[in-house]
Each structure stands twice: as structure tokens, then as C-alpha cells.
């Protein structure tokens, strides 16, 4: 069920990248700070707390961060248990920031139809653009006890509306 939400209520105000310079990590880490704003004067919106998909296109040097569930490919079978992803409420007329740590070196696993998985190692230190997509809704996502794992992911992929924004960003090493 799609709602007629006022898409101008939720905006991605900023996505900022910084190199994490802590000595706690052997490999480099990138601190990503996402700023969301709820401009509504009355509505509370719910968003997923953690990214559901991260991708890097080395050709365009674009880092994509998704706080939404993509639709499952037809040939993928899901075998994990049902769960409700962590969600955060953004109160009316409020701006919130989330911080994540991503590795500078990421492994991208793809499985072309009928073939074995391909593992590609990506270095995101030369990023020039960040695209962020966030799903939001006026009600939190809830799992029905009768839903199986695949049904949960399909329902989550159809939950709410999405908003996207892109930002020109570079890492200073």
C-alpha cells in the first residue's frame, strides 16, 4: 500500500565524509554522517537506522548508501529468520544526524545468473560523489507473525516512500 506522503517533509540535508583517524583500526575507515530533516509541523516519520545496501561505482567514483530495502532478485532464496529492522522516529520539525563507519577497502560480491559469485575489492578513497536514498513512513515497519523471510523483505521493499539526494564529496586523506 503506497501512501500519499508529503515528500517535501523529509529531506536529506547533507552527507559528509571524513577519514577516521583513530588508531583503533588497522585498515582505513571512512566516517559517513547523514543529516535528515523532518519539515512537517505535525507528522512523525520513521526511517531505517542502518544502511541496507552500500555500493561503489569506481567508474563514476560514486558511493551509494541506501537506508531502504531493494527488491529481491527472483533467483535469490532467503533462509534467515524474520526480523524488524531498527528504526528511528524523526519528530516534527527536527533534524537528526547518523554516523557510520565504512571501510576504505570494501568487498563487492555479485552473482551473475547461473555463475559463481564474483568478489571485487574496491577502494573508495577516490570518491567524488555520494548518493543517499532513504525510505520513510508515518508508521514503523512491522513484521506479521505469519510472514516468511522472503515476504518480510518484499514488504520492507514496498514500505513507505523514498527520497534521494546526491552530493559532490571527496575524502581528504
Regions found by a protein language model. Give the residues of each.
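A eukaryote-biased signal for short, well-structured alpha-helical docking elements
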Residues: 1-9
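One face of beta-strands
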Residues: 8, 13-15, 61
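Short structured motifs
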Residues: 15-20, 81-86, 114-118
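Short, solvent-exposed loop/linker segments at the N-terminal edge
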Residues: 22-28
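Hydrophobic core residues within well-ordered beta-strands of beta-rich domains
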Residues: 30-32, 96
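Asparagine-centered strand-capping/turn motif at beta-strand->loop junctions
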Residues: 34-43
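The feature marks short-to-medium sequence segments in extracytoplasmic or secretory-pathway proteins
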Residues: 46-95
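Surface-exposed edge beta-strand/loop patches
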Residues: 86, 92-173
Amino acid at each position: 500500500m503506497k501512501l500519499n506522503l508529503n515528500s517535501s517533509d523529509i529531506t536529506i540535508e547533507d552527507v559528509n565524509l571524513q577519514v577516521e583517524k583513530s588508531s583503533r583500526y588497522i585498515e582505513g575507515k571512512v566516517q559517513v554522517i547523514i543529516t535528515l530533516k523532518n519539515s512537517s509541523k505535525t507528522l512523525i516519520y520513521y526511517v531505517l537506522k542502518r544502511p541496507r545496501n552500500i555500493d561503489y561505482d569506481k567508474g563514476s567514483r560514486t558511493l551509494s548508501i541506501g537506508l531502504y530495502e531493494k527488491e529481491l532478485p527472483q533467483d535469490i532464496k532467503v533462509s534467515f529468520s524474520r526480523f524488524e529492522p531498527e528504526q528511528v522516529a524523526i519528530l516534527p520539525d527536527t533534524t537528526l544526524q547518523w554516523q557510520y563507519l565504512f571501510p576504505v577497502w570494501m568487498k563487492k560480491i555479485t552473482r551473475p545468473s547461473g555463475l559463481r559469485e564474483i568478489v571485487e575489492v574496491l577502494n573508495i578513497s577516490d570518491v567524488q560523489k555520494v548518493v543517499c536514498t532513504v525510505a520513510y513512513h508515518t508508521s514503523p515497519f512491522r513484521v506479521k507473525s505469519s510472514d516468511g523471510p522472503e515476504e518480510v523483505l518484499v514488504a520492507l521493499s514496498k514500505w513507505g516512500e523514498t527520497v534521494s539526494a546526491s552530493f559532490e564529496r571527496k575524502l581528504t586523506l
